[in-house]
A protein has these predicted regions:
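Carbohydrate-interacting/catalytic domains
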Residues: 2-178, 183, 204, 209, ...
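Short acidic/polar active-site loop segments enriched in Thr and Asp
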Residues: 59, 215-217, 357, 538-539
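Short catalytic/ligand-binding loop motif for oxyanion handling, primarily in non-cytosolic enzymes
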Residues: 100, 112-116, 186-188, 225-229, ...
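Core domains of carbohydrate- and sulfate-ester-processing enzymes
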Residues: 103, 107-164, 227-247, 252, ...
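Conserved alpha/beta catalytic core and glycan-binding cleft of carbohydrate-active enzymes
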Residues: 130-134, 355, 368-372, 377-543, ...
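Hydrophobic faces of well-ordered beta-strands that scaffold small-molecule active sites
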Residues: 176-178, 217, 284-286, 359, ...
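Substrate-binding/active-site clefts of carbohydrate-active enzymes
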Residues: 181-356, 363-390, 406, 453
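Generic recognition of stable, solvent-exposed alpha-helical segments in well-folded globular domains
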Residues: 201-204, 217-218, 265-272, 284, ...
């Protein structure tokens, strides 16, 4: 870590601590003195570099210095006993230049696996606070030197000029979040970018995102991870740790996502992307994985936390084995005071150094477990993040479950700060939209804000992040193209991935030339987007859904660094109708604040939200109900007139009739959107709507119609 302050444009933007300190000791030929104890990691000073790290169980710590790419250290500098205060070691080494070395640590101490103690001074250990990691500069290539799991840190001096960029602080409920994978978004040649698969490549797509109406991107893991971890070949195809949910270094951006291979440039390339996104009104939320690390279980490597303080950083069973609530071999001990401080430091680093706007916490329920794995009512780490002064305006989004069976959707400890991926929304809406019986009432509840899970009085309209799709599961196109998952190419005999995705192939498994099947699929995709963007709460969808990207039925593409996971941008032309519909619905959502939040009451005194299942103000449903109507009534953004929207969805396989509420004051219903309308390039989506009277409408089979009062 390092100290940061806002500097004028006239100053150099370099993270250097100016000091007139003089050496006090000489060890192994290096001039040294005690370092900056409150600044963990490597901190550049005007006359050297300070190195600070902590370990409770170690008896000795040694700093290892390497020439870039060298296999052996050129210097081993033990920390003098007087350079340790409590559990923290800190040493300022004079006259070393950041660009000319890489570093690591070794720790000596008891090696007693039965007690969870794994100290071994032969282990080369990565600094947990390292801001850059050496090694896999190019995707898919192992380092030529060192052991498979030997990572080293690089010292970073930043001179990036942010200008006047700051957090955008858009209201949470106004967000349309676009989840994407940095590499997969532009890696395919169809993306047309100059630097495919990189931060720079994603930057080239910002005009596209802005035109679509996106105001927040959620980046799948961008922390340093090892794509070669568990790499294997299946049927002649190289598989990788493609998604990146196996963190190596929490403070460092992933080096292989940088196009520019110059020393320490990955950070600036990421900053340039974030700055450009913000300049275009797009917030940046990053996916963080504090539930486990890439060190795995007892059979996994020891390259950092295990060798520094194994029984501090990880949850261990009474016989010193690793708990596995993550499903990935180990679990971080998030509510231990040391680990809690580490997590807070990390998130502050990304907020300050990279100016991100929020975080999505993978398997966040693990952060709510105590050191023995039991769920806590008020987990200290979650409370600390909710009230941290640096993170006070950050969006905090929880994936409110874990692989150990703890499911907290609607009950995640929030302090009115945390939002949640609403998995109930996904499941209930998928079931209703494909026509399952008994789901109408659930669908109404989900669309209107999931009040059974998130009280608007206590948690507002921001707690439920609504989504139909994410990286985990079918794409939206595949949701309506496959009844079964097709994960054979993952190499596990199709046993991996979710077996209950609530999908429906519309009559043919996979691709088909049947125009009726393809027409129905397109209509269901539009129905899904219409429901999502007319629902209370932030909306999120997976990148490529807006032009029907496919993973060919694979609903667990975590290892597929190929056309299965890469977006095929040629489909943008083929499915322009869907793209234009999504853009239309995002704009419609922006134009009608009543869809997103409570406004002032309408002058006509309609209730803010009312249900009309076939007839006005009929909120009753039964097992066979397939036609639902929801009316939102309030005031427009300027408070100059009423804002009244009627959402109508027929999930039945035959047309049904909807009677609309009578409008006062000379207003009339006008159709804005009809998912059954024939599409003509450049036209709207209102054609072929059959009005049977002033306040009666015929809703075609499996169709959404949206009306506004004018």
């Amino acid at each position: 870590m390092y100290m940061w302050r806002e500097r004028s444009k006239e100053e150099k933007h370099e993270d250097v601590v100016n000091t007139g300190l003089l050496p006090l000791d000489v060890v192994e030929g290096f001039k040294i003195r005690p370092g900056f104890f409150r600044m963990y990691g490597a901190c550049v000073a005007s006359n050297g570099v300070s190195f600070t790290i902590n370990s409770h169980g170690a008896t000795r710590c040694t700093l290892l210095l390497f020439k870039p790419q060298a296999s052996k250290p050129y210097a081993r500098i033990p920390f003098p006993d007087s350079y340790r205060i409590g559990d923290t070691y800190s040493m300022l080494v004079f006259d070393i230049k950041p660009d000319e070395f890489e570093y690591a640590f070794s720790f000596d101490g008891p090696y007693e696996p039965a007690k969870g103690l794994l100290f071994n001074e032969e282990n080369v250990l990565l600094d947990p606070y390292s801001r850059a990691v050496t090694g896999q500069r190019k995707w898919g290539e192992k380092p030529e030197v060192g052991k498979d799991f030997e990572y080293r840190a690089r010292v970073v001096k930043s001179n990036f000029d942010w200008g006047n960029i700051k957090q955008l602080e858009q209201p949470f409920e106004d967000l349309v979040i676009y989840e994407t994978h940095v590499r997969g978004y532009t890696k395919d040649k169809s993306s047309g970018v100059s630097a495919p698969g990189t931060f720079a490549g994603l930057k080239d797509k910002i005009p596209y995102l802005k035109d679509l109406g996106i105001n927040a991107v959620e980046l799948m893991p961008i922390f340093e991870f090892d794509e070669m971890e568990s790499a294997r070949v299946v049927d002649g195809v190289q598989l990788y740790n493609y998604w990146g949910y196996n963190t190596v270094s929490f403070f460092a951006p992933n080096t292989s996502y940088a196009f520019n291979e110059e020393h320490n440039h990955e950070g600036d390339e990421l900053k340039s992307l974030i700055k450009a996104l913000k300049e275009n009104g797009i917030e940046v939320i990053i996916d963080v994985v504090f539930n486990h690390t890439a060190e795995g279980n007892e059979m996994g490597p020891c390259f950092s936390f295990k060798g520094i303080d194994n029984n501090v950083y990880y949850m261990l069973t009474p016989d010193a084995h690793y708990y596995n609530f993550s499903g990935c071999g180990n679990v971080m001990n998030c509510n231990h005071p040391v680990v809690r401080s580490f997590i807070i430091d990390c998130l502050r680093h990304w907020a300050i150094e990279y100016r991100v706007d929020g975080f999505r916490f993978d398997l966040a329920s693990i952060l709510g477990r105590d050191q023995n794995g039991a769920p806590m009512a008020n987990p200290p780490i979650l409370e600390s993040l909710a009230f941290d002064p640096v993170l006070g305006k950050m969006k905090l989004i929880a994936e409110a479950w874990d692989a150990g069976g703890l499911y907290q959707v609607g009950s995640f400890p929030s302090w009115n700060r945390w939002a949640e991926w609403n998995g109930r929304y996904r499941d209930d809406m998928r079931s209703f939209l494909k026509g399952d019986d008994g789901m109408a009432g659930n669908a109404i509840t989900r669309i209107t804000g999931s009040r059974d899970l998130y009280s608007p009085e206590s948690r507002g309209h921001k707690a439920s992040v609504n989504f139909m799709t994410c990286h985990d599961g079918f794409t939206l196109y595949d949701l309506y193209s496959y009844n079964e998952k097709h994960n054979e190419k993952n190499g596990w005999n199709n046993t991996d991935g979710d077996n209950n995705g609530h999908s429906w192939n519309c009559g043919a498994e996979g691709e088909t030339d049947d125009p009726n099947v393809n027409g129905l699929r397109r209509r269901l995709i539009k129905n899904a987007f219409a429901a999502l963007l007319c629902s209370r709460g932030p909306a999120m969808f997976f990148a490529g859904d807006e032009f029907c990207n496919t993973q060919f039925g694979n609903n667990n593409a975590y290892c597929q660094d190929n056309i299965i996971s890469w977006l095929d941008w040629s489909r943008l032309e083929e499915f322009k109708e869907i793209h234009d519909f999504v853009r239309h619905m995002i704009q419609f959502r922006k134009e009608h604040p009543i869809l997103r939040k409570m406004t002032k009451p309408s002058s006509c005194q309609f209730p803010e939200i009312s249900v009309h299942n076939g007839t006005p103000f009929n909120a009753s449903t039964d097992y066979k109900t397939k036609l639902i109507g929801i009316m939102y009534a309030g005031r427009n953004e300027e408070d100059t007139e009423d804002d009244i929207v009627f959402y109508c969805m027929n999930a039945y396989w035959e047309p049904l009739v909807m009677q609309l509420p009578v409008l006062p004051n000379g207003k009339h219903w006008h159709v804005d959107t009809n998912t059954n309308a024939e599409y003509f390039d450049g036209e709207d989506f209102t054609a072929k709507t059959e009005l049977l009277g002033v306040n009666t409408i015929r809703v075609p089979a499996r169709t959404t119609i949206i009306l506004v009062a004018e």
